[in-house]
Amino acid sequence: MALRACGLIIFRRRLIPKVDNTAIEFLLLQASDGIHHWTPPKGHVEPGESDLETALRETQEEAGIEAGQLTIIEGFRRELSYVARAKPKIVIYWLAEVKDCDVEVRLSREHQAYRWLELEDACQLAQFEEMKAALQEGHQFLCSTAT
């Protein structure tokens, strides 16, 4: 049976003053162990938790961002399937926007660094094709639903 994990693809909209436009930036965390890969916050589902509860708890634990500091974006949910440490894994991601683009990120010991990145740079850091695709799909979803 596949391991099940859930997380949030967290983003902010940063104003670019000179061009009077906004840029979407994604939050990626760098793992402290293994190959030091970059991903959004995520973690394993605990007994009695819903998938979304898991995603919110893991975001608070790994990045110090609480549920009240986020807006979950309706209509976007992606399920990634891959092999991690020789075991099948399923990770479900939702999109979430920080309410304050200057929110403080407080890393747990599981991570050693974080970065806010525009799509192209985020995809370069995300080493796994499934994660790159999820970031691209999230960006496309946000651009297509912008008001």
UniProtKB/Swiss-Prot annotation:
Superkingdom, taxonomy of origin: Eukaryota
Biological process according to GO: AMP biosynthetic process; ATP biosynthetic process
Named cofactor requirement(s): a divalent metal cation
Motif (Nudix box): 43-64
Keyword Acetylation: yes
Modified residues (N-acetylalanine): A2
Alphabetical UniProt keywords: Acetylation, GTP-binding, Hydrolase, Nucleotide-binding
Catalyzed reactions: P(1),P(4)-bis(5'-guanosyl) tetraphosphate + H2O = GMP + GTP + 2 H(+); a 5'-end CoA-ribonucleoside in mRNA + H2O = a 5'-end phospho-adenosine-phospho-ribonucleoside in mRNA + (R)-4'-phosphopantetheine + 2 H(+); a 5'-end FAD-phospho-ribonucleoside in mRNA + H2O = a 5'-end phospho-adenosine-phospho-ribonucleoside in mRNA + FMN + 2 H(+)
Function: Catalyzes the asymmetric hydrolysis of diadenosine 5',5'''-P1,P4-tetraphosphate (Ap4A) to yield AMP and ATP. Exhibits decapping activity towards FAD-capped RNAs and dpCoA-capped RNAs in vitro.
Record-stated family: Belongs to the Nudix hydrolase family.
Name this polypeptide is given: Bis(5'-nucleosyl)-tetraphosphatase [asymmetrical]
Naturally occurring in which organism (per UniProt): Bos taurus
Name of the gene: NUDT2
